[in-house]
Amino acid sequence: VAFQVTSSSNECAEIKKHGLHNLQWVLSNDTTLNRFLKNNNITFDIESKLMYINDIAYDVDYEKYNDLDVISKRKEQLHKIGHKIYYDFQINAFLFCKDIYDYSTIHEAPEFLYTLSLLNKATKEIDLKWKNICKPYVVKFKSKLKDFAYFTFYGSEREYIKDRQDNWLMLSRLVDTFFSRTSWTMLPYVENHSISV
């Protein structure tokens, strides 16, 4: 059993109906978050890697910003937004967490909104607007260890392939993390694009 910490303005009705989905799907479909962003004049064209704020287009192809020697504050934020959408877009969950309130503010608003809020004046405090209309929830779901991305448990894909048969390394990392007082959080990345709850 894994769990996702989220926030919702409709008592998770959308999640109950459609399940959990990755960020790309959420920004491409008629979802509560997507409608909220549109009401705040923010839209996304995922395929073209563009974000529109008040009809001004912003390039969020994070790979374009990777090798720049000098990067402006705005380009750095666009890189971070693009990174969330095109690299770190999967469903995130916890296998265990000692205290979710110590982990971050994800119980108040999606991390993506916080990243977005740092871009410019038009997006400033978008995360606080969301927080003011939503309540926090914990959504539990069943998932097999094979459903999690290899980098949840392994330092490299090679390490994963080597351990795939017996999973001893993965299991030892799970046990070590569970019993460690210093890192009592295990945050897996779910490879599926959606999860039924």
What are the functions of these language-model segments?
Residues 1, 9-15, 28-41, 86-89, ...:
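Conserved NAD+-utilizing ADP-ribose enzyme module
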Residues 1-85:
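ADP-ribose/NAD+-binding catalytic cleft of ART/PARP-like enzymes
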